Design a protein with these regions (language model features):
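Active-site cofactor/substrate anionic-group-binding motifs, chiefly glycine-
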Residues: 1-35
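Glycine-rich anion-binding loops and their surrounding alpha/beta cores
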Residues: 5, 9, 24, 46-53, ...
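Active-site-proximal loop->helix
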Residues: 33-51
Length: 274
């Protein structure tokens, strides 16, 4: 998503991406470290002991093996390395917040994009259409999140087979029963990572519900489900079963095996001087 909603929430989209991967959906997440918030996707993944700067072939291996790969934006868009410090100093959203979701190196055909302003919904839908995206949801909630909210209605523009339509998700109709927005406020990378670990172990709270709502969107766009309520209930059942924590451990350990094997392949024909 664009980020820049100013809410400083927990890493909902990153957690939902990991949850989706534990449910068998292949996810190529494109992200960065924090710019206008305390903790970006790159920060929380590092705090979860997931390596974020793998080579493209290693990322592909991880997606094929564990259904999850993270593409660290500065590694793929070299100019961003020079822009990054200035963005951090500004501390507010800029045009680069809008560019990020449109520049995935994975060239995906299915995508969930959260935007910080409802006015951007159709703009992004048309941009993704021009980029050849097959199926996408662009989301913005009435309480200001660039995510599907567990507290308020979320407005969605759906792009499917070049057709654009409007839909909405109302958590009240889904009996989400989330408590209060303050329960989604995040902090530093360790704090946010611990929250992800807790819900993956089966802890039931507002964060878990928010993650399941956004994972449900992924199940719809991946065409695992056609009914959002069924997708949400499936995600809830899965996360409460603690299956996600076992998968997280595989993702944490997967890059080590990938790097080790790749290193052997790179150096097996080379001779080193003593």
């Amino acid at each position: 998503g664009t980020g820049g909603d100013g809410m400083n929430t927990l890493n909902i989209s990153t957690a939902s991406a990991l949850l989706l991967s534990s449910m068998g959906v292949k996810v190529a997440k494109h992200g960065n470290k924090a710019v206008s918030s305390k903790c970006g996707s790159g920060d929380v993944l590092e705090a979860l002991n997931i390596k974020i700067d793998l080579e493209p072939n290693d990322i592909e291996t991880q997606i094929n093996k564990n259904n999850f790969g993270f593409m660290f934006a500065p590694n793929y868009h070299s100019a961003m390395k020079f822009v990054g410090p200035t963005r951090k100093k500004i501390g507010k959203r800029t045009i680069f917040n809008l560019i990020g979701p449109l520049s995935s190196p994975a060239l995906v055909k299915r995508q969930i994009v959260g935007v910080f302003d409802k006015k951007l919904l159709k703009i992004f839908a048309n941009a993704l259409k021009n980029l050849g995206i097959k199926y996408a949801w662009i989301v913005n909630s009435e309480d200001g999140l660039d995510e599907i909210s567990p507290y308020a209605k979320t407005h969605i523009i759906q792009l499917k087979e070049n057709k654009i339509s409007e839909i909405s998700i109302d958590p009240k109709k889904l009996n989400v029963n989330a408590d209060k927005f303050e329960n989604l406020i995040g902090d530093d990378a360790k704090f946010n990572a611990d929250k992800i670990i807790n819900i993956f172990k089966g802890e039931d709270n507002d964060f878990s519900k928010a993650v399941c709502l956004n994972a449900a969107a992924g199940l719809i766009v991946n065409e695992n489900h056609i009914n959002f309520a069924d997708a949400y209930n499936n995600a809830r059942e899965h996360i409460l079963s603690s299956k996600a924590i076992k998968h997280l451990e595989k993702v944490q350990n997967g890059w080590k095996c990938s790097w080790k094997n790749n290193s052997k392949e790179k150096f097996k024909d080379k001779k080193f001087k003593k």
